[in-house]
């Protein structure tokens, strides 16, 4: 091998790095650095190691291998032993920037056969390297002996801890266990025979047990929900009974079977159904009120008898009833004789414009009109007939108008019309034996128009 020549700057950098990392003594470092500089500046190539020269005996190789194990007890295994040893240990700290390969320090041997690298590596230091405690490099040579290890078995015997044991304790080398390894083996050897719960069977058994305990299903003392359901069912069945008008048996138990607080049960007050009206007039009124949404309410209809002013619903009812009654009188002669009817002449040549106006608008002709109208009501006629009650009502209306002729003159036309309408629909007292019937409004207007027309002709 050729001698490697190192520049002085590289040795200075190496010396500075060794001083910082290993804390060597200053004097020893200066002497070693000076010797290294002299060897590096020598133009003659240094002689190679006897071990690597050809023709040397084999005993020198054995001596060199035995000398590799000599180390100081305090410094332990140096990191530079890998560079001087040909066995292949890694070098630490010997190469800083020059990137020396393994065995490069072997070229720095002196000519007298002494290994310069051995003296360089055997320099004592104050602090030791980091004690790994689990590696072969740190634990093989810290046994405190200066004996030379000539065999690999002796070096392995000096190891304090086994690397395989360390790796095994750290978890390496084990097989990956599955999740089933966490389950005890007894669960696999003797599996459970449970198949779950049959909810249908459970509910049936609960119902059967409740029926056996109380046939009437009065279990409110044990199940509070039964009480709530019973009260709710009673409320709905009472409502159904009220609508359908059919009696329904309640579910709520009596006090003798059920000790409950009355305040907990809500008081349900169901009004009795109203009796059906037997009067045809009331039934017709209800039928029209259901069909006509614009008619009055129930309170208004109930107070129609006390109020002299009739509403639109009463007017419709009276008109329909009078028409039906008039048709029956025309078709049944026996009914006509029983009532003692009086004929009314047919209406002919009636002016619609004059018939629509009431007779109140002509105060000067009221006296003559009343007389003519009274004679007209007494005339016999084959086409239209009315009874004595209708004649009395008509005469009462005309008499009421004649009693206040002066007040009618001072009133406005709108007040006269409203008063006339009010008098037309006012109730007339009749005998108890005779059923009261009102004259239709159309017939009254036509009769008044006919009387007025006769007065104008006179």
Swiss-Prot record:
| Residues the record lists as Phosphoserine modifications | 312
Q: Which keywords does this Swiss-Prot/TrEMBL entry list?
A: Cytoplasm, Endoplasmic reticulum, Membrane, Phosphoprotein, Signalosome
Q: Where is the composition biased (Polar residues)?
A: 346-356, 439-450
The entry's cellular-component GO terms read:
COP9 signalosome; cytoplasm; cytosol; endoplasmic reticulum membrane; TCR signalosome
Q: Where in the cell is it found?
A: Cytoplasm; Endoplasmic reticulum membrane
Summed up, the tissue specificity of this protein is:
Expressed in lymphoid tissues, with highest expression levels detected in thymus and lower levels in spleen and lymph nodes (at protein level). Detected in CD4(+) and CD8(+) T-cells, B-cells and mast cells. Not detected in monocytes/macrophages.
Taxonomically, the superkingdom here is Eukaryota
* PTM comment, free text: May be phosphorylated in response to store-operated Ca(+2) entry.
Which intervals of the chain are annotated as region Disordered?
328-356, 439-458
Q: Which SMART domains match?
A: KRAP_IP3R_bind
What InterPro entries does the annotation carry? ITPR-bd, TESPA1-like
Tell me a Gene Ontology molecular-function term this record carries: signaling receptor binding
**What is the deletion mutant like?**
Mutant mice display defective T-cell development, resulting in notably fewer mature CD4(+) and CD8(+) cells in the thymus. The architecture of the thymus is altered, as characterized by smaller areas of the medulla. Mice also have fewer peripheral T-cells in spleen and display diminished T-cell antigen receptor (TCR)-mediated responses.
One GO BP? positive regulation of T cell receptor signaling pathway
> What ranges does the record list as Basic and acidic residues composition bias?
328-339
Q: Does the keyword Endoplasmic reticulum apply?
A: yes
Q: What does this protein do?
A: May play a role in the regulation of inositol 1,4,5-trisphosphate receptor-mediated Ca(2+) release and mitochondrial Ca(2+) uptake via the mitochondria-associated endoplasmic reticulum membrane (MAM) compartment. Required for the development and maturation of T-cells, its function being essential for the late stages of thymocyte development. Plays a role in T-cell antigen receptor (TCR)-mediated activation of the ERK and NFAT signaling pathways, possibly by serving as a scaffolding protein that promotes the assembly of the LAT signalosome in thymocytes.
Q: What is the protein's quaternary organization?
A: Interacts with PLCG1 and GRB2; the association is increased with prolonged stimulation of the TCR and may facilitate the assembly of the LAT signalosome. Interacts with ITPR1 and ITPR3. Interacts with HSPA9.
Record protein name field: Protein TESPA1
Q: Which organism is it from?
A: Mus musculus (Mouse)
Q: What is the lineage of its organism?
A: Eukaryota, Metazoa, Chordata, Craniata, Vertebrata
């Amino acid at each position: 091998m050729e001698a490697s020549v190192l520049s002085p700057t590289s040795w200075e950098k190496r010396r500075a790095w060794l001083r910082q990392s290993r804390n060597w003594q200053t004097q020893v470092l200066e002497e070693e650095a000076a010797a290294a500089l002299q060897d590096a500046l020598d133009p003659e190539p240094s002689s190679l190691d006897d071990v690597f020269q050809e023709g040397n005996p084999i005993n020198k190789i054995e001596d060199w291998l035995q000398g590799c194990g000599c180390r100081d007890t305090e410094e332990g295994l140096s990191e530079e032993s890998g560079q001087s040893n040909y066995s292949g240990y890694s070098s630490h700290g010997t190469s800083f920037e020059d990137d020396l390969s393994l065995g490069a320090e072997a070229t720095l041997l002196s000519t007298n056969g002494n290994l310069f690298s051995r003296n360089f590596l055997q320099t004592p230091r104050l602090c030791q390297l980091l004690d790994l405690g689990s590696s072969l490099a740190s634990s093989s040579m810290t046994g405190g002996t200066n004996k030379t290890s000539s065999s690999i078995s002796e070096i392995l015997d000096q190891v304090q801890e086994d690397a395989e044991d360390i790796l095994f304790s750290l978890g390496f080398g084990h097989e990956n266990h599955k999740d089933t390894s966490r389950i005890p083996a007894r669960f696999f050897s003797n599996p459970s025979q449970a198949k779950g719960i049959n909810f249908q069977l459970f509910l049936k058994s609960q119902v059967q047990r409740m029926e056996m305990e109380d046939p009437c299903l009065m279990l409110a003392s044990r199940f509070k929900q039964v009480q709530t359901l019973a009260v709710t069912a009673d409320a709905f069945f009472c409502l159904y009974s009220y609508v359908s008008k059919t009696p329904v048996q309640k579910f709520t138990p009596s006090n003798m079977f059920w000790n409950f607080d009355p305040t907990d049960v809500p008081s349900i007050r169901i009004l009795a159904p109203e009796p059906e009206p037997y009067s045809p007039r009331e039934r017709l009124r209800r039928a029209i009120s259901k069909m006509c949404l614009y008619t009055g309410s129930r309170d208004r209809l109930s107070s129609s008898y006390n109020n002299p002013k009739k509403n639109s619903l009463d007017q419709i009812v009276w008109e329909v009833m009078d028409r039906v009654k008039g048709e029956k009188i025309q078709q049944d002669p026996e009914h006509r004789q029983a009532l003692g009817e009086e004929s009314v002449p047919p209406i002919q040549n009636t002016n619609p414009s004059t018939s629509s106006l009431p007779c109140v608008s002509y105060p000067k002709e009221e006296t003559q009109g009343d007389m003519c109208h009274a004679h007209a009501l007494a005339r016999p006629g084959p086409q239209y007939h009315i009874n004595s009650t209708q004649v009395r009502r008509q005469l009462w209306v005309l008499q009421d108008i004649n009693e206040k002729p002066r007040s009618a003159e001072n009133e406005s036309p709108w007040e006269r019309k409203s008063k006339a309408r009010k008098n037309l629909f006012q109730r007339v007292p009749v005998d108890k034996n005779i059923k009261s019937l009102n004259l239709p409004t159309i017939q009254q207007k036509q009769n008044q128009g006919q009387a007025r027309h006769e007065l104008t002709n006179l």
